[in-house]
Structures are given as C-alpha cells and as structure tokens.
C-alpha cells in the first residue's frame, strides 16, 4: 500500500499586520468594515456603548470583511474593534474606533483629506502627511487623536503620531491616516 502523505500543517499567519476598522453609522445601526489580514481564518468584532464594557458581538469567516450591528439607540456613541485570528490564535487587532448613531445631536466624521496621496523619499529622509477631518453637523466629541497614523511596513517607513514619515529602507508601504470612526485615506510611500 502506498503511504499517504500527511496534510502539510498551515504555517501561522504573520503577526502584527495592520488592521483598520471603519464604522458607518445610521439611526439604529452601525455598519462595520475592515481591511484584509493575510492568513486570517476568522474575524471577531467586539463592541459596546461608549461607557460600557466591550464584549464579543460576532465572529465571521476569514473571507468576510463587513458586519452590521442593528437595533441600536439613535444619537448614541458606540465603540468597536476587530481582531483577526488563525488556528494559532490572534494575528492582530484594530485600534478602538468610535461612532455616533444619527438622529441625535452628536456629529461624526464624514471625510478625511490628505495633502498628498504618495511620497517618494530617500533612506533617512522625512516628510509630513497633513491630514484633516471634516465632521457632520452637530456636536463633535473627540475620544482619540483627530487622526491616527499607521504604517503597513515599519521596516520600510515609520510614521509618528503627528504624521511624520521617516524612510528606513528601500521598498514600498502604505500609511493609513484614519479618523476616530475609522474613515481613512491611504498614502503610498516609496523609499529609494
């Protein structure tokens, strides 16, 4: 009898990948979406009212990149984060994002703008992304920095809390510039 080769064990996905979650609120629901994590076998969505304790709301497959929470209260602040898992455990998670359901006096971020969509830098040089947010009508309350920045490959380029890119090594990466509700602009960085 020929011997049957065992199934090769799937290698663990690369840890620390960037995962950006986004919330789009309606009156009684919040639609969540998120960026792809390579090797993810499932995603778990956690959330709560802003003053509540975050708990697991839903687990979805690794091919799913959106989910909507329904039956929420209008004009209320909710917080969420998304985590990606494989059979070895958690690969990565997003930062906590905050959004306000409509129908009340609370505003939400409706647009993010950046001064440049791409930067080409020599190793060791720096450049600054100037990102701005535009809120909807109403009272806007900040729960995080106005814009948060994250590099998809910190060995190529890092980015500071103020949007200063530093070129580290030859290659390409992206910087996500995202508002507290996860709305983002993606900036390409090329290091020569």
Where are the model-predicted features located?
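Extracytoplasmic soluble-region selector
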Residues: 104-192
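Short S/T/G- and acidic-enriched coil/turn segments that sit immediately N-terminal to beta-strands
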Residues: 63-68
């Amino acid at each position: 009898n020929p011997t049957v080769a065992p199934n090769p064990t799937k290698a663990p996905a690369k840890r620390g990948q960037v995962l950006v979650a986004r919330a789009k609120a309606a009156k009684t629901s919040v639609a969540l979406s998120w960026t792809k994590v390579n090797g993810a076998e499932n995603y778990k969505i956690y959330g709560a009212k802003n003053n509540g304790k975050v708990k697991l709301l839903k687990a979805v497959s690794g091919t799913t990149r959106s989910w909507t929470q329904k039956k929420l209260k209008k004009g209320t602040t909710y917080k969420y984060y998304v985590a990606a898992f494989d059979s070895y455990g958690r690969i990565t998670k997003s930062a906590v994002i905050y959004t306000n359901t409509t129908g009340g006096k609370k505003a939400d971020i409706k647009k993010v703008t950046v001064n440049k969509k791409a930067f080409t830098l020599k190793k060791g040089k720096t450049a600054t992304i100037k990102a701005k947010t535009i809120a909807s009508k109403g009272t806007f309350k900040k729960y995080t920095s106005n814009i948060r920045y994250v590099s998809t490959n910190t060995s190529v380029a890092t980015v500071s809390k103020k949007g200063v890119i530093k070129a580290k090594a030859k290659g390409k990466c992206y910087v996500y510039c995202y508002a507290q509700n996860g709305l983002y602009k993606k900036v390409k960085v090329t290091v020569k």
